[in-house]
């Protein structure tokens, strides 16, 4: 264009004569470009919902290990092998678990696009404009990640939770506003077709097989299809709650199965408390290998309330004796102590021995509290407060997460929480200190909390025939001929910190004070 060329030559000539001319020309050009960009952005924000594209992605499945046998958590190549004399013990193999063919996330594009359009429509009806929307498909839940337009309040979207659920005609919708670490808002929507998260796919993942956790618990998969694991040794105690039939028992079985696939009988002992008498009975076959019990107990699975109290008091005695050994050894925790033991740095004549981890699992904790009350609550609280360093960890489960069952004393000492679907928002607040568990869809859908924000996880599924095969395999392996014997429990007064009073060392004014403070006969009558 002749005119453009002429204008350009004039501009260059002017810049040659005046040094400021080029600077002023550049400033005008930048202002024009900025104004045009703002106009384009404003126009894009006003587009109708059908013009907003959406990326649909499925996170890749965890890489599977090639071996059929799960390796132990940490191989102890040391002078003393803590696995002796049962070094020929073989860990359970993965072919004992059922392998489901349909193990990947299923994408129904029509469903995703329909949900996207409904979400945009509902938000638009309330004056909420969005810039982008992205969907990540998980096993049972799809996460729609939304980037709202400038000036949109997060609380406004959060308040539309019920309207979005009504529009999508779905239960279990949850809004995360904002998603931690991102400048986006998440809307979790259940898939029309859910996929089973098998225990086999979890234990066969590289993440589980190569973990260095002391007590690895594989719970399931997240919305992003990632294997979700926690270390019970670091939690250090876990509170599990959920209404009947929502996956609580399956979750406990997944926890036990994870530990059985990773730990040697010399490294782990279980104390299983089952007031219902049916939940843990399948594990009685591995009592000699993996159980711990008071000496005169006939049944490896504890079901009687009086025996539960004795066992808990026995665990308190065990905890105190272990602390004495740690003090003698100059160790701060069980890991340091065991490392000194296997490196020949402790004298066996001083009573030192290898310490296995002890995991106490209590099902139907509510029944125990209703029948035994403080007799159960006090030793549990004491163990939860002090036992972490000596390798004693607790998992308690209940289907009634009320404040009378889960007291403030219990909650304060159980930082790890798992909530399956509960019946009310009040129950959700009791277990998680927030709502959300009442909005889950059931069938293993759960929230895990051990910090600020809960993580939504689809619990791994392991059924009774699989557990029976695992227990049969373990029982055929070389191992101890009887359960680990727990120390004799202290009598009731000593367990509660009381005991008989030695009157010889009392203050000389004690009897006078006692008479002064005691009620008069008239008051007693």
What are these regions (language model features)?
Residues 86-92, 179-184, 188, 206-332, ...:
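P-loop NTPase catalytic phosphate-binding loop
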Residues 1-237:
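Low-complexity, intrinsically disordered P/S/T-rich segments
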Residues 115, 157-160, 255, 311, ...:
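Hydrophobic side chains in well-ordered alpha-helices
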Residues 146, 341, 408-412:
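Short glycine/threonine-rich loop-to-helix capping motif typified by GTGT followed
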